[in-house]
UniProtKB/Swiss-Prot annotation:
This is Cytochrome c oxidase assembly protein COX18, mitochondrial. Keywords: Membrane, Mitochondrion, Mitochondrion inner membrane, Transit peptide, Transmembrane, Transmembrane helix. One of its GO terms (molecular function) is membrane insertase activity. It is found in: Mitochondrion inner membrane. The chain crosses the membrane at residues 168-188, 224-244, 263-283. Mitochondrial membrane insertase required for the translocation of the C-terminus of cytochrome c oxidase subunit II (MT-CO2/COX2) across the mitochondrial inner membrane. Plays a role in MT-CO2/COX2 maturation following the COX20-mediated stabilization of newly synthesized MT-CO2/COX2 protein and before the action of the metallochaperones SCO1/2. Essential for the assembly and stability of the mitochondrial respiratory chain complex IV (also known as cytochrome c oxidase). Its main location: mitochondrion. It is a multi-pass membrane protein. It comes from Homo sapiens (Human).
Amino acid sequence: MLCRLGGRWLRPLPALQLWARDLPLAPVPTSGAKRPTLPVWAVAPVSAVHANGWYEALAASSPVRVAEEVLLGVHAATGLPWWGSILLSTVALRGAVTLPLAAYQHYILAKVENLQPEIKTIARHLNQEVAVRANQLGWSKRDARLTYLKNMRRLISELYVRDNCHPFKATVLVWIQLPMWIFMSFALRNLSTGAAHSEGFSVQEQLATGGILWFPDLTAPDSTWILPISVGVINLLIVEICALQKIGMSRFQTYITYFVRAMSVLMIPIAATVPSSIVLYWLCSSFVGLSQNLLLRSPGFRQLCRIPSTKSDSETPYKDIFAAFNTKFISRK
């Protein structure tokens, strides 16, 4: 009953170092046209929202200032209209920052997935050894269970260290992408309302004529709701594509999926009340996110990124997604 772990052999029962008691569980505007009215929180100076509050602090924070300078720099360097500057900035940031992090996330998750057979083997052997020791020493079921859990956590942690693939590393994308999304949204809000910026009003005037198509005024909400609905639809597509690829989700994963679906729908009315510049950024960001999600399912791109092959990989991922989508939403009676 030997399992190899990082070049070292797990010894038989006497050397497993099992502990039975006192085991703490580790916590696993266009001219001549009337512009739509923005809600107070979207147009008022930041100080009017909440004096000395978190909103004011965040809107005037250094990261938001940096995001403003990035947007202004791209606009000045390219000479593009503001809708183009927003689009280009979004694509550049997502491509330079979040795409590598997303590839790293898939790399870590692939290594964790490839460890599952070894983890199952260790779990089976450890369970047998704990059962033997429990019979020898007369442990209660509770003591035996705590002993198993403590040692299983230790052994799994050793595997993660050995292969340098702790699952927490896969969350780095969220910790970078979410703050970046918030800072860019606040920066566009400041520029669109003339708040908290020395050149705010001149930029606001440029944004008022910097749109395109049905949203020429980027400082006003999209009265047609096309942009807000598009944001919601793309976000829902991302959620569903991720959900379709997961088989046998845990209860927690199911709750998270429903929560993200609800947030995607809730974002639609929220997006209908903020300046179109912000919603355009949200739309571009979501579209790039969807594109990255699909790109990272390509076997060729995964190989280019040196993402390990796993049992769940498919040679035809896009056909599989379409087939699963068709089965779940179109062919369902």
